[in-house]
UniProtKB/Swiss-Prot annotation:
One of its GO terms (molecular function) is GMP synthase activity. It holds the Pfam family GMP_synt_C. PROSITE patterns: GATASE_TYPE_1, GMPS_ATP_PPASE. Residues 206-395 form the GMPS ATP-PPase domain. Disulfide bonds: none annotated. This is GMP synthase [glutamine-hydrolyzing]. GO terms for cellular component: cytosol. Homodimer. The keyword Protein biosynthesis does not apply. Catalyzes the synthesis of GMP from XMP.
Length: 520
């Protein structure tokens, strides 16, 4: 069975990308209902969509104005496909603008809305079935609809938005001015589920077993009888990729585990024992720590660190691949969140990712990225579906650049050791407290800041270590974890007493946004 035939058997809802930083959340929410969903460029044609054969289309939000000269548009024939369409924020304005309505700066129609607002439903609608007549939603728009196209009618408004929800049931076109994909829209999940199940007719039978079948077929068709190299870090993402690839192509896969000197405590030996021993992956271990640390000496800028590490990573692969024959592909554990934070065609780059933006232009391999449509929690579910043990699947996320981006400023062996040892203590105590499944991610950072302290009878002037612990569902947004004070106290006491050159511990209580998870 080909990949296309597998895809045709799977119901899917396509999200067209108009530039919102969080439009991937739309696809993520829809997948929660057992419906496959993915992002496509707004430039896609009606014919291309017809070939994909979705049961529904969502037009995402975005930062532009639909009446601007550089506005992102849509193939008008998409409206004639007979496929249900939901426009969100910019998407609703685009439907209105293209079908004969009017969109103006919000000041001419009421006020701009940024933050939670109360939606007042004026009519019943399939889209809002089971939700209250008044509900809190997240608004974020500088433009507003003042006239709706022929055939549409008002469903809901807010105090500052005359048309907050509209629909044309005859043509299966729906528009909402707010963002149901974010948690601040209290009934947002219900609205998206109504669209997927009630309006689009989704069965809700998408699962990780479907994904495994589809990806294995895709990998086999892409690779054929050629060979693949996988950069194995020992983290969840690359480990899951390794097991998936081995299931697809067996001994055509060679894993290269690069010890760049930026790993967590004892991580190298753990990787070899777990994946090389238990799963039988063919792993070549390369000690390239001196190469990386020499290149990173005196480099303070985090983007330069990422680029240097990304480039050198591939050059190490080139060196190893030259010793092998017939290697054409490089596999990576790139996730959906990596792609959006590195910027899409329509979205601004937040930070370059090692798996996305750190690759040299003269790279000698074709890329295979089996996880690039998945979020972190879906990767864990995939690992379980592949039969991987929980100690691997629930391993703490670890960035490709390793501890390099958990040391602020220039990297030294001394700084690396403070992070390596303090991180080990943090992970040990979180596990002892039974919190390792409740906290999404937790690690320590050498802030690069030194402060005065007193230890024993002497004055110290040593490093400040920050603890970062977050809770999240999908990694796109996050809150700081409210760890028990007694646990934090024990962690702090142990780090200061057991780790050399550290005399102060601080706790990062910043959410994402405005911060990112990693400090660099």
């Amino acid at each position: 069975m080909t990949e296309i035939s597998i895809l045709n058997d799977v119901q899917k809802i396509i999200v067209l990308d108009y530039g919102s930083q969080y439009n991937q959340l739309i696809a993520r929410r829809i997948r929660e209902f057992g419906v496959f969903s993915e992002l496509k460029s707004h430039k896609i044609t009606a014919q291309e969509l017809h070939e994909i054969n979705p049961i529904g289309i969502v037009l995402s939000g975005g930062p532009n104005s639909v009446y601007a000269d550089n506005a992102f548009g849509i193939d008008p024939e998409i409206f004639e496909l007979g496929i249900p369409i939901l426009g969100i924020c910019y998407g609703m304005q685009l439907i209105t603008h293209k079908l004969g309505g009017k969109v103006v700066p919000a000041g001419q129609a009421g006020n701009r809305e940024y933050g939670q607002s109360t939606l007042h439903l004026r009519e019943t609608s399939k889209l809002f079935s089971g939700t209250p007549q008044e509900q809190l939603v997240l608004m974020s728009h500088g433009d507003a609809v003042t006239e709706i196209p022929e055939g549409f009618h008002l469903v809901g408004d807010s105090n500052d938005c005359p048309y907050a929800a509209i629909e044309n049931t005859e043509k299966n076109l729906y528009g909402i001015q707010f963002h149901p994909e974010v948690r601040h829209s209290v009934y947002g999940n219900d609205i998206l589920k109504n669209f997927a199940i009630s309006i689009c007719g989704a069965r809700g039978d998408w699962s990780m077993d479907n994904f495994i079948d589809m990806e294995i077929t895709k990998i086999r068709e892409t690779v054929g009888d050629r060979k693949v190299l996988l950069g194995l870090s020992g983290g969840v993402d690359s480990s899951v990729v390794g097991v998936l690839l081995q299931k697809a192509i067996g001994d055509q896969l060679t894993c290269i585990f690069v010890d760049h000197g930026l790993l967590r405590k004892d991580e190298g030996d753990q990787v070899m024992g777990m994946l090389g021993g238990k799963f039988g992956l063919n792993i070549i271990r390369v000690d390239a720590s001196k190469r990386f640390l020499d290149l990173l000496a005196d480099v303070e800028d985090p983007e330069k660190k990422r680029k240097i590490i990304g480039n050198e990573f591939v050059y190490v692969f080139d060196d190893e691949a030259s010793k092998l024959k017939g290697v054409d592909f490089l596999a990576q554990g790139t996730l959906y969140t990596d792609i959006i934070e590195s910027g899409t065609e329509t979205a601004q780059t937040i930070k370059s990712h090692h798996n996305v933006g750190g690759l040299p232009e003269d790279m000698q391999f074709e890329l295979i990225e089996p996880l690039n449509t998945l979020f972190k929690d879906e990767v864990r579910a995939l690992g379980i579906a592949l039969g991987m043990p929980e100690e691997i699947v629930w391993r703490q996320p670890f960035p490709g650049p390793g501890l390099a981006i958990r040391v602020m400023g220039a990297i030294t062996e001394e700084k690396l050791e403070t992070v390596r040892e303090s991180d080990a203590i943090l992970r040990e105590e979180i596990a002892k407290a039974g919190l390792d499944r409740d906290v999404w991610q937790y690690f320590t950072v050498n802030t690069g800041v030194r402060s005065v302290g007193v230890m024993g009878d002497g004055r110290t002037y040593d490093y400040t270590i920050a603890i970062r612990a977050i809770t999240s569902i999908d990694g796109m947004t996050a809150d700081f974890a409210q760890l028990p004070w007694d646990v934090l106290k024990k962690i702090s006491t142990r780090i200061v007493n057991e780790v050399d050159h550290v005399n102060r511990i601080v706790y990062d209580i910043t959410s994402k946004p405005p911060a990112t998870v990693e400090w660099e």
